[in-house]
Amino acid sequence: MARLLVFLLTALPMMAWAEPVHLRIQGSNTLGSALLPVLIRAELRAEHATQVQVHSAKADNESVITATRADGVDVQVDIAAHGSSTGFDALARGEADLIAASRPISDSEARQLQAFGDLRSPAAEHVIGLDGVAILVNPANPLSELSLDQIAQVFSGQVRRWEQLGVAGGDIHLYARDERSGTFETFRSRVLAPKQVNLAPTARRFEAGDRLAAQVAVDRQAIGFTGLSTLHGTKVLAVADGTAAALLPERTLVASEVYPLSRRLFLYLPTPPSPQAAALIDFIQSPAGQAIVAEQGFVSQQIVAQRVAPVANMPAQYRALAEHAQRLSVNLRFQPGSAALDSKATQDVQRVIEYLNQAGKPHRKAVLVAFGDPKDTPGRAALLSRLRGEAVRQALARGGIEVLEVAGLGDQMPVAGNEMEQGRLRNRRVEVWVY
């Protein structure tokens, strides 16, 4: 009996240690249909796992990944990619360890899920890449650009014929993502809600972006929207916000979130965190993980320096930077109504620190240029923008970076209209330039 007891006492911890690891990911189709399976396979292989396999599940837009870790433990990762909202719903039911979302958590969701921690905290909210909601038409369509106002008129049904937009084509056929999609929520909040209109009931709805794009590619009268990884032979229109120039969703413009329909791609890690989920996030945020994000058609957060062509109407200080320095491919933004960095900027500051150290430019080689939105009091916009720049300077200083200068340019050079709060938030930004 004593020997049996000793055996059980020693064997039970080993049995527990060898228990299979099971990770459940639910939410965004944009993330879960292709990107996450590739990232998970890469993370498992980086940890020297063997027999890494992807299996199709019984339902559409679901998959199962299995592997055996180097320590002999079996791993199973279940992915259900039915839309961002379904991920938060699954967490509420206790059916998810990690939430994939192509839009930020809403106020009501954050309140409902308080039992799982502050899901807006940097420890829980992880931006793993960027994307743009692209406006798609058939390749035969001669149209090249639309404003956000025009897009709202089209998708609400106020504009129903292509002739109303200056091109031939007859009736407009609308294609949209479904209600549970984070892509649709981004489109609704950025395009429809500011004009207080709803999606026309005639729109055809799709759970998956690749299927939507495939239909637009064969319908000469079509217009739709989807993420950058599922364009599939369609024509992408440039988008204008207010009086700003129309922009295509080019990688540099999405990386800096200047493109009007740029969006962040999130993973939400609830409390208590799953160790397997936390390890996956760490891998995705690494250079190897971010390289995969870019390979899969999204925009990574790896920082690069780029030249900006000087333009005559630039502020003199800004034009001098364009002539002699390079701008980094990141804009640092803030929590609403605050000079505190948002969750993405908190991560990006560390990337800027790493970039400047690796480039051999930690001391007095960086200039911060801060912008804001218009204020009633003269000079207040410039003051507030400088305060935001100082907040970034202090964050960089904690990482050993000595900034050469902080410039507050106030409400100059807006990248969005200031009529709506979301536009004002986009204009409150800090750029990093390097000599």
What are these regions (language model features)?
Residues 117-137, 145, 147-167, 233-269, 283-304:
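Periplasmic-binding protein-like
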Residues 19-155:
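N-terminal segment of the mature folded domain
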Residues 361-362, 371-435:
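Periplasmic OmpA-like peptidoglycan-binding domain that tethers envelope proteins to the cell wall
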Residues 293-326:
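Pro/Ala/Gly-rich low-complexity, hydrophilic intrinsically disordered segments
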Residues 58-71, 88, 180-247:
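Ligand-binding pocket segment of bilobal, Venus flytrap-like solute-binding proteins
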Residues 34-36, 121-203, 207, 213-217, ...:
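Extracytoplasmic ligand-binding site segments that recognize negatively charged/polar headgroups
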Residues 317-322, 327, 333-369, 393-398, ...:
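Periplasmic peptidoglycan-binding/anchoring modules of Gram-negative envelope and division proteins
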